[in-house]
């Protein structure tokens, strides 16, 4: 069985091949989310605590949280479910998934280091992989660098170098939700436009109501005139 060990603190991970079945037997009958002492796996993991996060069986079917079985099952999966990515809107599909209980049929078991042990693990705890991309949203940049609202966020955007052919240049993401004078001016314009449109609609409605009242009065007067003429003709 292969153990895929991840250390989120440093952003590293490494796959370790374990040929001795007795060493991985400690994981059997354990579920996703449970924690295991690393000393039971080997002396190099003394003091470590691992958390089971998933895995794949020998045929490549992924483990699914919540399926309390050590075998494969077929489930009707939709958008939002793990182990399935819908290709069309509203699509559902019956897929084979592996249960969340660890067994000997697994090819890869994913672990996360919850507690670091005495020895350093080569390529995992002794190395650091920096984040390639920094925060994009203005508030997230402020939180990341501990800035106040008075500080200019644009000076703190994390830029990265890009080499295209022989030319090297820096690239920065577009800051989202950045409040600038142009944005405030645009908001003011939109608000004023909304007020003007509402005012124009009210004026048009008042004008229409006035015209309608005038037409009704004319029709009423016309009917009264017709009745008057008819009455005078009957008298004659």
From Swiss-Prot:
Residues annotated with Phosphoserine modification: 232-233
GO molecular function: structural constituent of ribosome
Signal peptide positions on this chain: none
InterPro entries xrefs: Ribosomal_eS6 (IPR001377), Ribosomal_eS6-like (IPR014401), Ribosomal_eS6_CS (IPR018282)
A UniProt-annotated Pfam family: Ribosomal_S6e
Keyword ATP-binding found: no
Changes after translation: Phosphorylated.
Keywords: Phosphoprotein, Ribonucleoprotein, Ribosomal protein
GO biological process, one term: translation
GO CC aspect terms: fungal biofilm matrix; ribonucleoprotein complex; ribosome
Family (UniProt): Belongs to the eukaryotic ribosomal protein eS6 family.
Protein name per Swiss-Prot or TrEMBL: Small ribosomal subunit protein eS6
Organism whose genome encodes this protein: Candida glabrata (strain ATCC 2001 / BCRC 20586 / JCM 3761 / NBRC 0622 / NRRL Y-65 / CBS 138)
